[in-house]
């Protein structure tokens, strides 16, 4: 599976993410072992990193935070996330798809 997969049914984007918590700023770093590496500022304590990641992705894709689904990796750095019907696709992600 690729880092970014465009889905037809249901329509959306499935992302395989390698998460780097406690970074100096929120950013898409690039590819890391066939996953999209994303750095976020939140610590990996009590789900703070997951919540911050979903909030960051909702801003990037211009979708409600509640619509983004964390499919795999709730307690790991390796995650699989589904973003339904994104209004905007960031150029860093579009070139990978």
From Swiss-Prot:
One cellular component term from this protein's GO annotations in UniProt: cytoplasm
A Pfam family recorded for this sequence: DUF167
NCBIfam families linked to this entry: DUF167 family protein, PRK05090.1
Family to which the UniProt record says this protein belongs: Belongs to the UPF0235 family.
Cross-referenced PANTHER family: UPF0235 PROTEIN C15ORF40 (PTHR13420:SF7)
HAMAP family: UPF0235 (MF_00634)
Descriptive protein name: UPF0235 protein HAPS_1504
Origin species: Glaesserella parasuis serovar 5 (strain SH0165)
């Amino acid at each position: 599976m690729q880092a970014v997969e465009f889905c037809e049914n249901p329509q959306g984007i499935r992302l395989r993410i390698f998460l780097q918590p406690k970074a100096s700023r929120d950013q898409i770093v690039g590819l890391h072992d066939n996953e999209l590496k994303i750095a976020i500022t939140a610590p990996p304590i009590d789900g703070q990193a997951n919540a911050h990641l979903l909030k960051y992705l909702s801003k990037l894709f211009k979708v409600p935070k509640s619509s983004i689904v964390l499919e795999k990796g709730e307690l790991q750095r390796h995650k699989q996330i589904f973003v339904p019907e994104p209004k905007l696709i960031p150029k860093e992600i579009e070139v990978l798809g």
